[in-house]
Structures are given as C-alpha cells and as structure tokens.
Amino acid sequence: MPTPAPPTELLPWERAVVLLSCVLSALGSGLLVATHALWPDLRSRARRLLLFLSLADLLSAASYFYGVLQDFAGTSWDCVLQGALSTFANTSSFFWTVAIALYLYLNIVRATRGPCTDHLVWAFHLISWGVPLAITVAAVCLKKIGYDASDVSVGWCWINLEAEDRVLWMLLTGKLWEMLAYILLPLLYLLVRKHINRAHQALSEYRPIWEGRQLQRGSPTSMADKKLILIPFIFICLRVWSTVRFVLTLCGSPVVQAPVLVVLHGIGNTFQGGANCIMFVLCTRAVRTRLFSLCCCYPRPPTQNPPGASIPPKMGESQESRRTPEVPST
C-alpha cells in the first residue's frame, strides 16, 4: 500500500450532510424497533431478524455521528472507542443483512421449518454478533483501530493508517464482508424471486380467475417481488462508494479526496437504517397504515381483506406459510 496522502479535509457542508444522514438513519432504525414493539402480530421471524439488523444500524449511526461531529485529528481514547463501536456495528450489520437473505432463501426455496428454523436463528445470533465482536476485540487489543485521515472514512476513526498490516485489518473489519455481501445478496434474492415466480406460474394454471383478480387489483406479492430486487440493489448503491474509496486509497490516488466521493461514502455508510425504514415501514402497507393511523390519532378499522387478497397470517406464522412466502417487507 502506498504512503498515505495528506489527510482528507472534511468541509462543513460535507459534515452537515453526513450528520443529517446519521440522524435520519437513527430515526429510521428507531422506527423499525418501535413498530416491532407496538404490533406483536407483525412479528414474523423475518421481521425479528430485521429488528436485530435495525439495532446494529442504530448503534452504527450513533457511533458514526460522534465520529463525524468530532472529526478526529489523531488517535485518542474516544477515537478508539468510536472506531471500535462503529466497526462492531457495521460488521454486524453486514452479517445480519446476509442472514436475512439466507433465512428467506432457506425458508422459501428450501422450505426449512420447525426446530431447524429455531437452530438457524440461534446460529445467526452467534455469527452476526460473535464474529464482529471477536474481530473488534482483537483489533482493539492489537492497537489497530485509530486515526485514518478520513481517507477510508468520513471523519470517524477506523483502522490506523500507520499500522503495517492495515490492509489486512481493513479487510477483516469490514471490507471483506462488504464485498462478500455484494455477491451473496443478489444471488440469494434472485434465487428466491425465481422460486416465487415459478410458484405463481404454476398456481395461475389452476386458478385463472383468482389470477385475473390479482392483476386487476395489483397482486400483493408483486410488491414483494419488486423488493426482492430493490433490497440488494439499494445495499450495493449505498455501500459501493466506501469500496471505491478503499480501492483508491490502496492505489494512492488523490481522487479519494474528491468531495462528491466523500459525501457519497458518508451517506452510504450511515444511511442503511434509513433505507431499511423506507423499505420495510413506509413501503409496507400493513405497517404504513397502522403507523399513519397512530400518528393521525385515527382508530384503526378492524382487519378486513379486500376481495382477492390473502388472509393475514397469525402471529408467528408469517414466515411459516408455504402458500404465500413472505418477504419482511410485503
């Protein structure tokens, strides 16, 4: 890796934009947690996994906010603490994002049910919290976390650029898992989407009348189908700028300090919670309707299904039904 360039200066407007992104992400993650607490009947297994992703994103947004606000000029105790928290939360967010995709694949395509599902969720907890924690503790103990001149961050602390094996630790504390997610997320969601499309085609051969009604009204599964494409697409669009700056830093390119790249990197790393909120709250009719009713103080009408709509699953059964496999966003 070439000798690090002079520190990237974080302009006031850049800092303001990234701080706003942190706040919106924290609010979005908090809203996801609140909807989970308010409405027990929406607590499918997939949305419970989404809850843990939201907690990781909330911690990530808070730690990034402090780092951007401080705009560290060197390694200090709070720089190391902030770097450790953001490293743990960010890496955990990668693991939970992939865990949700893997869960949907196994549940919908492989029809995994019963005790196997419970064991799978426990495995997700062990890996998605345990691996990031172990990596972060090792990085702190070996004094790898510190000031990074904002070349691979946007004001916050991450891996100390003075460390000789900094590239290895950058990979271990985020970039390796980030690049794996670029591959796994599109692959898993495309497999799920392909399976659902095949199921719909087979069903339409035996239920042409039902299918016609769905086409007239707009099939509830069509929104889930779109989100199966949007979930990995949004993840990549947010995270790719971080990867671009990482590669530019490895090459010693001065382009790494370009204001546009800096801002895109800052938003991409901090807005994951906000993006999840848009996808799984604001773009989810069942949650959005209840939320608007609550905010506007309107009494929520008794659950009523329009003609042709599927019956809402009972508590805990959203992911268990084989007829209408649910994305945690439908």
Curated annotation (Swiss-Prot):
Orphan receptor that promotes neuronal differentiation of radial glial progenitors (RGPs). The activity of this receptor is mediated by a G(q)-protein that activates a phosphatidylinositol-calcium second messenger. It comes from the Eukaryota. This is G-protein coupled receptor 157. Pfam families: 7tm_2. The keyword ATP-binding does not apply. InterPro entries: GCR1-cAMP_receptor, GPCR_2-like_7TM, GPCR_2_secretin-like, GPCR_Rhodpsn_7TM. GO terms for molecular function: G protein-coupled receptor activity. Belongs to the G-protein coupled receptor 2 family. One of its GO terms (cellular component) is plasma membrane. GO terms for biological process: adenylate cyclase-activating G protein-coupled receptor signaling pathway; cell surface receptor signaling pathway; circadian behavior; phospholipase C-activating G protein-coupled receptor signaling pathway; radial glial cell differentiation. Gene3D superfamilies: Rhodopsin 7-helix transmembrane proteins. SUPFAM superfamilies: Family A G protein-coupled receptor-like. The chain crosses the membrane at residues 16-36, 49-69, 88-108, 120-140, 167-187, 228-250, 260-282. Residues 37-48, 109-119, 188-227, 283-330 are cytoplasmic. Residues 317-330 have a biased composition (Basic and acidic residues). Its main location: membrane. It is found in: Cell projection, Cilium membrane. Signal peptide: none annotated. It is a multi-pass membrane protein. Residues 303-330 are annotated as: Disordered.
